[in-house]
Regions:
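N-terminal helix-cap/turn-to-beta initiation motif at the start of protein domains
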Residues: 30-44, 88
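Bacterial N-terminal signal peptides
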Residues: 12-24
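Exposed beta-sheet edge/beta-hairpin loop segments within beta-rich domains
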Residues: 128-129, 137-140
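Short beta-strand segments
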Residues: 54-56, 82, 135-137, 161-165
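Central antiparallel beta-sheet cores of small beta-barrel/beta-sandwich binding domains
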Residues: 48-130
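Edge beta-strand at a domain terminus
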Residues: 142, 146-148, 153-171
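Boundary at the C-terminal end of the N-terminal hydrophobic targeting segment
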Residues: 26-28
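Bacterial N-terminal signal peptides that target proteins for export
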Residues: 2-14
Length: 171
């Protein structure tokens, strides 16, 4: 009789465990995003980087894209241009970035761009990961007039982020 009770109890516990797992699985939501999750980027921004001024601008979401740029100046001359296109993907926006030296000389091949895939978004913040999984980027509007881009690298099996660009809104 005791053995039969143990078997029945074990079956009941197993069934309860399976129901809990299935319920949690059914309630799990895949994180997807939209271009509207990036609307906080919109505007004209300025900052300082590597001893010189930087300037950035992003459009509002329209026509299934957001366009942006960063212009870096060193010694009163252009040092680097970055052009961004955020476009919809299966799981959320995909960021494509091209880099240019002065004279619009591309650093990437003609048909190649750095591609960053959407991971998640919160209010005024979005996280992307580079295709080769070597870098993560956080876009974050910390206040109405401050926008920060952070770069993350894997260190000791965890992502460590540092501010890369800190911008102030241009009125």
């Amino acid at each position: 009789m005791m053995q039969s009770t143990k078997v029945t109890l074990l079956k009941a516990c197993s069934l309860l465990f399976a129901l809990c797992v299935l319920t949690n699985f059914a309630n799990a939501q895949t994180t997807t995003g939209s271009l509207n999750d990036l609307s906080f980027l919109e505007g004209h921004w300025k900052g300082t980087y590597n001893g010189g001024p930087i300037e950035a601008g992003w459009t509002a979401p329209e026509g299934n894209n957001i366009m942006g740029y960063i212009r870096m100046i060193k010694d009163d001359k252009p040092a680097l241009y970055e052009v961004f296109a955020f476009e919809p993907g299966e799981k959320g926006p995909i960021a494509r970035v091209k880099h240019f030296k002065p004279g619009l000389i591309a650093l990437e091949e003609k048909n190649v761009s750095d591609t960053y895939n959407f991971i998640e978004a919160k209010k005024n913040q979005a996280l992307f990961e580079k295709d080769d999984v070597s870098v993560r980027i956080i876009y974050e509007r910390r206040s109405q007039n401050q926008l920060v881009i952070q770069r993350g690298k894997m260190e000791d099996n965890k992502w460590v982020f540092m501010d890369l660009f800190v911008f102030t809104r241009v009125p």
